[in-house]
C-alpha cells in the first residue's frame, strides 16, 4: 500500500477531505492537515533486531519512520543498482526525507523495507524465522513488478492492518459503513481494473464531491 507521498502524487488534482490509510494499514494520514493521526510503531529494540538480520544476510534495509509528522527514510550503503535506482527516483520528492543511517537516533520506525533478488529475500525471510522474529512482526514478501527477478520484504508492527485501521477511522468519524475500492479480486467491495490511477478516477466519479474538493 502507498505512503502519504505516493498518495499525494497520485491524487495531485484532488484535495482529499478524509484521512487516508497508508503503509499497508500501519498509519492513518490527514492530507489536509499534513498530520499522522495514528501509526503502528515498531518497538525500537525489535526493529533493530530485524535490521540486524538484514545486515547479517548482506541485504540493505531502509528504515521508514515518522518524526514530527514527517516521513523519514534512513538508508545505508547500497548493495546493488536496483536499490540505488529506487533511491534516485524517490529522493527528490518534497514529501520524503532521505537521511543517512548514521544519523538515526530515536525516530519511531513504522516499517523496514528491503529489495533484492528473490532467492536472497527468501533467505532473509527464512533467517527472520530462525531468529524467532516472524511471530513478533507482520511481514509482506512479494515480487517487485517493476524489477523482474527481485522481491520486496517489508516488516511492520504485528497489529498493523488495513482492516484494523479502517475500523479506527470509522470510529473517529462516527461512521457505521464503508466501501472499499480495490484493484484485486476478493480484497474489497468494488473492483477497479487498470491499477491505482484508474482507481482514483473511478473514486472521483462515484463519490465527488463528498470526499474532496477539486483544486
Question: Where do the model's predicted regions map?
Answer:
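Mg2+-dependent phosphoryl-transfer enzymes with acidic/Ser/Thr/Gly-rich catalytic loops
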Residues: 154-215
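Short, charged, surface-exposed secondary-structure boundary motifs
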Residues: 29-33, 149-150, 199-206
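Conserved acidic, metal-coordinating active-site core of Asp-based
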Residues: 69-181
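Short, conserved active-site loop motifs that form the nucleotide-linked donor/cofactor pocket
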Residues: 18, 137-138, 189
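Structural signal for conserved beta-strand scaffold positions within catalytic alpha/beta enzyme cores
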Residues: 22, 63, 141, 157, ...
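Short, polar loop motifs at secondary-structure junctions
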Residues: 2, 25, 143, 183-187
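Phosphate- and divalent-cation-binding pockets in alpha/beta enzyme and binding domains
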Residues: 5-9, 123, 165, 202
Amino acid at each position: 500500500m502507498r505512503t502519504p507521498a505516493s498518495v499525494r502524487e497520485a491524487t495531485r488534482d484532488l484535495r482529499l477531505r478524509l484521512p487516508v490509510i497508508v503503509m499497508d494499514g500501519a498509519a492513518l494520514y490527514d492530507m489536509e492537515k499534513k498530520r499522522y493521526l495514528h501509526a503502528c510503531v515498531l518497538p525500537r529494540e525489535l526493529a533493530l533486531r530485524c535490521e540486524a538480520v538484514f545486515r547479517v544476510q548482506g541485504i540493505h534495509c531502509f528504515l521508514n519512520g515518522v518524526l514530527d509528522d514527517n516521513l523519514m527514510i534512513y538508508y545505508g550503503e547500497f548493495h546493488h543498482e536496483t536499490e540505488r535506482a529506487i533511491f534516485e527516483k524517490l529522493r527528490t520528492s518534497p514529501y520524503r526525507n532521505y537521511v543517512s543511517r548514521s544519523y538515526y537516533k530515536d525516530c519511531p520506525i513504522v516499517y523496514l523495507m528491503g529489495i533484492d533478488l528473490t532467492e536472497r529475500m527468501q533467505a532473509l525471510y527464512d533467517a527472520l524465522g530462525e531468529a524467532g522474529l516472524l511471530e513478533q512482526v507482520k511481514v509482506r514478501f512479494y515480487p517487485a513488478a517493476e524489477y523482474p527477478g527481485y522481491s520486496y520484504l517489508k516488516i511492520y508492527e504485528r497489529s498493523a492492518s488495513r482492516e484494523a485501521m479502517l475500523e479506527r477511522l470509522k470510529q473517529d468519524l462516527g461512521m457505521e459503513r464503508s466501501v472499499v475500492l480495490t484493484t484485486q479480486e476478493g480484497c474489497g467491495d468494488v473492483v477497479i481494473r487498470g491499477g491505482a490511477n484508474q482507481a482514483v478516477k473511478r473514486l472521483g466519479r462515484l463519490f465527488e464531491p463528498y470526499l474532496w474538493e477539486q483544486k
